[in-house]
């Protein structure tokens, strides 16, 4: 959470990564389920009390693995004081095949694709689309700007901030970028993934006008999954399926739907 210098004491999520809030350390393997739930409940309740005693306004998204909202829902239960609000969001996890000897068409990941996505992949391969690793952050930013300029819509994120995020991830060794080009070498799409010890996260994507006439938008993800699989990544979080078009496209890759929540509380004026 980030403190914001507004009239009221405010702590809100930065907005630059999808998830935030409370994260738990691995539990003692000798604890049973009841003990784990009880311990997490007490920890969450303590954090809630600390936050609400310190800040007037609080807002953050939970992680999909954070499932127990009861301490938030029961805060000031049967009292007049402020109550937490929450709204439901979704992302999708794609499990990648662990057995590297299995060709991509035989993987469980491929079998979970919907019909139209399989067709796009077949067309993309037949047309000679090639996907490769890229370290060119400046090129990504240029294509990102082109994407929004072409569509005549406001930028979702400021380019300088994106560059800073990508550079920081790259220096830490936690950035994987891919570019997909047509058979004549024209780049159509680029995708940027962050990674940690648990999974990889699709954080930014960008398309040139070439993507509208080819399958590079599909292939940069599909081929990217295969390259991620061979680099040891076992799961990909496509980070958000919360609008119709974006949701359909990402879910067509056959991932598991995962809920998470935006939690907030507004104090008295």
PLM-predicted stretches and their roles:
Residues 152-157, 255-261:
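Short, structured secondary-structure boundary patches
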Residues 60-61, 134, 158, 238, ...:
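Residue-level detector of family-conserved "landmark" positions at structurally sensitive sites
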């Amino acid at each position: 959470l980030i403190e914001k210098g507004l009239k009221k004491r405010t702590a809100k999520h930065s907005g630059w990564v999808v998830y935030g809030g409370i994260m738990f350390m691995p539990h003692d393997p000798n604890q049973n389920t009841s003990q784990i739930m009880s311990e997490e409940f007490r920890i969450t309740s303590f954090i809630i009390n600390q936050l609400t005693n310190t800040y007037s306004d609080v807002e953050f998204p939970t992680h999909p693995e954070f499932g127990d909202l009861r301490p938030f829902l029961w805060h000031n239960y049967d009292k007049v004081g402020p109550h937490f609000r929450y709204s439901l969001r979704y992302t999708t996890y794609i499990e990648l095949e662990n057995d590297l000897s299995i060709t991509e068409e035989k993987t469980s990941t491929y079998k979970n694709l919907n019909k139209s996505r399989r067709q796009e992949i077949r067309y993309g391969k037949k047309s000679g689309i090639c996907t490769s690793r890229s370290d060119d952050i400046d090129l990504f930013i240029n294509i990102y700007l082109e994407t929004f300029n072409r569509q005549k819509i406001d930028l979702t994120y400021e380019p300088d901030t994106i560059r800073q995020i990508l550079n920081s991830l790259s220096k830490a060794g936690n950035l994987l970028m891919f570019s997909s080009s047509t058979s004549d070498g024209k780049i159509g799409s680029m995708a940027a993934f962050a990674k940690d010890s648990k999974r990889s996260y699709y954080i930014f994507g960008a398309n040139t006008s070439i993507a509208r006439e080819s399958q590079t938008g599909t292939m940069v993800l599909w081929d990217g999954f295969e390259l991620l699989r061979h680099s040891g990544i076992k799961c990909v979080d496509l980070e958000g399926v919360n609008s119709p078009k974006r949701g359909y496209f990402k879910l067509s890759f056959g991932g598991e739907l995962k809920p998470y929540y935006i939690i907030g509380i507004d104090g008295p004026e």
